[in-house]
A protein has these predicted regions:
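Surface-exposed, low-hydrophobicity beta-strand/loop segments enriched in small/polar/acidic residues
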Residues: 1-123
Length: 123
């Protein structure tokens, strides 16, 4: 399996502290291994960031960061379940992207490239 790097830039529009923006990035079915969030220098600390994989088979939220414009690395995972559907303590796998990655910003200022995100996916 190969690892691919993608750079995603999201701009926001609207009023200061309540501007929003979103971008859908077409990806193959893959595992999201890491995401580096780098915010515009003027992005406020009220910024909310959500990564999700919309659509089929189901919409899945992969990462939610609230009230933060701090540059950071994230490694989204999902907890494994056993055959009865119970969570397995300490057992996690990379988050699965179902063909599209939706990046959404809220609570931001109106900024071009409010977020520059670098992701690494295993295809």
């Amino acid at each position: 399996m190969a690892i691919e790097k993608h750079t995603i830039k999201v701009s926001t529009t609207g009023s200061s502290g309540s501007a929003t923006g979103s971008l859908v990035t077409a990806l193959p079915y893959c595992e999201l291994l890491a995401a580096r969030l780098a915010f515009h220098a003027s992005a406020p600390g009220t910024t909310d960031t959500t990564l999700s994989s919309p659509g089929g088979p189901v919409s899945v939220t992969l990462l939610t960061i609230t009230n933060s414009a701090t540059d950071a690395w994230y490694y989204p995972t999902h907890q494994l379940d056993d055959s009865s559907g119970s969570a397995i303590t300490g057992a996690y796998i990379p988050a699965v992207v179902h063909g599209n990655l939706l990046t959404e910003l809220a609570g931001c200022d109106a900024l071009t490239d409010a977020l520059t995100m670098t992701i690494f996916v295993r295809v």
